[in-house]
């Protein structure tokens, strides 16, 4: 599940997306559309009836998990931002060691333990819980997810780096400064 924005130009630049061999979606939001979602199977883009800005991210992610659950009912989901470069072989190799319901790069804020938003993993059990997430808890999507999943089995797993020099050894590189996009 790749979180993007309907005006984003980054998706076309992410070559790793073309190598995905399992069902995936690219999430966009449009609060003005009538339908709860519009899904284009060819492009994998699902446009959800929700805000498409930073403050609306908790609602967008909740709606995204609901769509993915109803459409695909997957065993797990990796939530990935559109400013990530991902080594898919390494990412899927981690599944062998992820014996948890929620995993990612650990953060702590406002008394909430959560995994940073650019890339995290949730199990089937967690997907079911996230469909009913309280979106009013925080404007930050990753904090809202962490609060919602506070009673699940968690595992710190450093999926990504923000340091380009570690990019060849890491599972993913977070281009948060948009140097390469």
PLM features: residue spans?
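Active-site-proximal specificity loops/subdomain of glycosyltransferases
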Residues: 25-75, 85-89
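A recurrent flexible, glycine/aromatic-enriched loop bordering the glycosyltransferase active site
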Residues: 107-121, 135-138
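Conserved donor-nucleotide/metal-binding helix-loop-beta segment in metal-dependent transferases, i.e.
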Residues: 86-111
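Conserved nucleotide-sugar donor-binding
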Residues: 87-89, 115-132
């Amino acid at each position: 599940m790749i979180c993007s924005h309907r005006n984003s130009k980054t998706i076309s630049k992410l070559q790793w997306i073309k190598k995905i061999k399992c069902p995936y979606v690219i999430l966009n939001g449009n609060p003005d559309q009538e339908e709860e979602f519009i899904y284009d199977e060819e492009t994998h883009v699902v446009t959800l009836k929700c805000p498409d800005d930073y403050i609306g991210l908790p609602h967008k992610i909740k709606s995204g998990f609901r769509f993915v659950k109803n459409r695909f009912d997957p065993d797990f989901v990796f939530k990935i931002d559109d400013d990530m470069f991902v080594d898919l072989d390494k990412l899927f190799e981690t599944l062998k060691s992820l014996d948890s319901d929620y995993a990612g790069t650990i953060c702590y804020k406002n008394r909430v333990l959560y995994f940073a938003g650019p890339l995290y993993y949730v199990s089937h059990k967690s997907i079911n819980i996230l469909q009913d997430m309280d979106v009013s808890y925080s404007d930050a999507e990753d904090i809202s997810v962490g609060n919602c999943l506070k009673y699940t089995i968690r595992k710190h797993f450093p999926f990504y780096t923000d340091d380009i020099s570690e990019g060849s050894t890491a599972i993913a590189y977070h281009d948060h400064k948009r140097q390469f996009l």
